[in-house]
Structure formats: C-alpha cells, structure tokens
Design a protein with these regions (language model features):
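SAM-dependent methyltransferases
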Residues: 142, 157-162
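FNR/FR-type flavoprotein reductase catalytic core
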Residues: 1-119
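Glycine-rich, flexible loop/turn motifs
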Residues: 50, 71, 145, 151, ...
C-alpha cells in the first residue's frame, strides 16, 4: 500500500477517533523535516487520548462533539475557529470526517491526503473487499475503483469519491 507523502511547508494533520494514533508518527516526521505542523484532534467528548504526545511536534487543537474541550463541533469547525491554513492537509478518521476534510480542501484549493479506514480481508488486492470509488478509470479493468489495501490506504482526496 501507500502511506502519506510528506511535504515541506505548513501542514495541518487531522485525526478523528481511531484515526488519531496514525497521525503521531507523521507529526514527528514532518517536524523533524522542518515543516510547520498543526494538529487538529476530533473527539466525541472530553475523554482525550494522545493529545500530550502530539505537543512536542505540533500546535495542537481539539474539537469535541459535546463541547466539553476545545471547539464545540467537528475538526473543520476547529480549523475555521483557529484560522489554520496549510499547504497540505493530512487526515485519518471516520468517513463523515473525511468527507468534510475533502470538501474543505476543495473550498480552500489545498492539497489533502486522506487515509481510508476499510476492512481488508486478504490484504493483497485479490478479494476486492476493500474497494473504494475513484475519480479516474483504471486502464486495465475500465472501472472507477481503487483497492484500499494495494492502491491506498492513503489517497489524494480529489482522487476518490467518498
């Protein structure tokens, strides 16, 4: 599969729920490479995890659905409230969050890389259990599909239909 392509400049990393832990190593690597890193972590409530672990590598912002900590609402609400901008957005989390990230990135004309969370039965692309819709046609199969296990799990947001 493919991971995040690290780029220099301003980076906003967005993690929601179980998509938060994968962003920690990326935050560390980007910081070590000289990027200006901000992290937005989305939680349901004030039961925060990994926030302190991100702090050495990034400015950390939090959104909670219940408003108990940080911005009340979702990660996009937190980005807008804090006036964050980026050369590249990196995101991992639930599908509704990724849809919001994709729409926000398109609105701001900013590159976004998203990591899809899909069940992967075989892990080698044979079973097609992890297929997602893509915006381009595969030259071999002539369909609009990508295998998350082989072609992803990270995609440019504009390359997939969520």
């Amino acid at each position: 599969g493919n991971g995040f392509t690290r780029k220099s400049g301003k980076a906003v990393l967005i993690g929601g729920g179980i998509g938060i832990p994968p962003m920690l190593a990326l935050a560390k690597a980007l910081k070590e490479e000289g990027a200006e890193v901000s992290v937005v972590l989305g939680y349901r409530d004030g039961d925060l995890f990994l926030k302190k672990e991100f702090e050495p590598y990034a400015d950390v912002y939090v959104s909670t659905e219940d408003g108990s900590v940080g911005t009340r609402g979702n990660v996009i609400d937190a980005i807008r409230e804090n006036g964050l901008d980026a050369d590249t957005i990196y995101a991992c989390g639930p599908m509704p969050m990724l849809r919001g990230v994709k729409a926000y990135a398109a609105e701001k004309e900013t590159e976004a890389q998203i990591s899809l969370e899909e069940r992967m039965a075989c892990g080698i692309g044979a079973c097609l259990g992890c297929v997602c819709n893509s915006t381009d046609v595969d030259s071999h199969s002539h369909v609009h599909n990508k295998r998350v296990c082989k072609d992803g799990p990270v995609f440019n947001a504009e390359d997939v239909t969520l």
